């Protein structure tokens, strides 16, 4: 008996994607969004198969991701934004609850949700991850969404 191995393909054609973008720290989020769109299009998605929803901040991402997932219109959802540490504990609360919320939506709905929200200590770290020194984490999230959408269709 052979071992069956499942692995999602990086082919986005025919798939529909929802993207939730936090407007807070928009100068970073817009670069991440560019990476998401680039990643999806390069792997065969059409612009008509991408729907983008902007939310005020990272804390609001899970609710809109849940609404998108429950609509059953999307094969995968991509969440992007930037939470940058400040001098108060606010960062910890927002990053923690947003992360848990996104994971809960994915587990509750069975829709893959790619986590492309930067949680960094400095603005410089965020800039590095939004298309400069460390690549674009939006692009990486798009590739993750494609792979997971295809993998879940196989299982």
Swiss-Prot record:
Transferase keyword on record: yes
GO BP, sorted A to Z: riboflavin biosynthetic process
Reactions catalysed, as given in the entry: (2S)-2-hydroxy-3-oxobutyl phosphate + 5-amino-6-(D-ribitylamino)uracil = 6,7-dimethyl-8-(1-D-ribityl)lumazine + phosphate + 2 H2O + H(+)
Domain of life: Bacteria
Example GO molecular function: 6,7-dimethyl-8-ribityllumazine synthase activity
Keywords noted in UniProt: Riboflavin biosynthesis, Transferase
Stored SUPFAM superfamilies: Lumazine synthase
EC number, as in UniProt: 2.5.1.78
InterPro entries listed in its UniProt record: LS, LS/RS, LS/RS_sf
Pathway listed: Cofactor biosynthesis; riboflavin biosynthesis; riboflavin from 2-hydroxy-3-oxobutyl phosphate and 5-amino-6-(D-ribitylamino)uracil: step 1/2
Binding site for 5-amino-6-(D-ribitylamino)uracil: 24, 58-60, 82-84, 115
Catalytic class of the enzyme: transferase
Active site: 90 (proton donor)
Gene Ontology annotations for the cellular component aspect, listed alphabetically: cytosol; riboflavin synthase complex
Sequence positions that bind (2S)-2-hydroxy-3-oxobutyl phosphate: 87-88, 129
Functional note: Catalyzes the formation of 6,7-dimethyl-8-ribityllumazine by condensation of 5-amino-6-(D-ribitylamino)uracil with 3,4-dihydroxy-2-butanone 4-phosphate. This is the penultimate step in the biosynthesis of riboflavin.
Stored HAMAP family: Lumazine_synth
Family per record: Belongs to the DMRL synthase family.
Record-given protein name: 6,7-dimethyl-8-ribityllumazine synthase
Organism listed in the record: Acetivibrio thermocellus (strain ATCC 27405 / DSM 1237 / JCM 9322 / NBRC 103400 / NCIMB 10682 / NRRL B-4536 / VPI 7372)
Gene name per UniProt: ribH
